[in-house]
Amino acid sequence: MPRQPRNTSGIKHRAGELRKISTPAEAKLWDCLRRNKINGVSFRRQHAVDKYITDFCSPREKLIIELDGSQHGGDMDAERTRFLMERGYKVIRFWNEDVIKDIENVLLVIRQALEK
């Protein structure tokens, strides 16, 4: 399998900055994902995949989790999802509000995605 091209320093820097300013929903989900808590799977937070920075990514499982707030949606998210899927990733999306109010269901969906 060909290796993914190295991230540019600008993307890496931006990903590092985003890790410092997590939303409440990102922080809550990260607490559930970190240290391989779900099915023993390792996730990375604010991980760059080519030209995009993903909210959460398991490179080994090729699974990306995106959290959406009011600033997301539309053609740009569709293009981003298409781009990532073309590179073999499965992308699942949740609304920030769902993570805050119904984390158990969010975790169930993630577990199901990992089992497929």
How would you label these PLM feature ranges?
Residues 18, 22, 47-113:
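Basic, amphipathic alpha-helical patches used to engage nucleic acids or provide basic targeting signals
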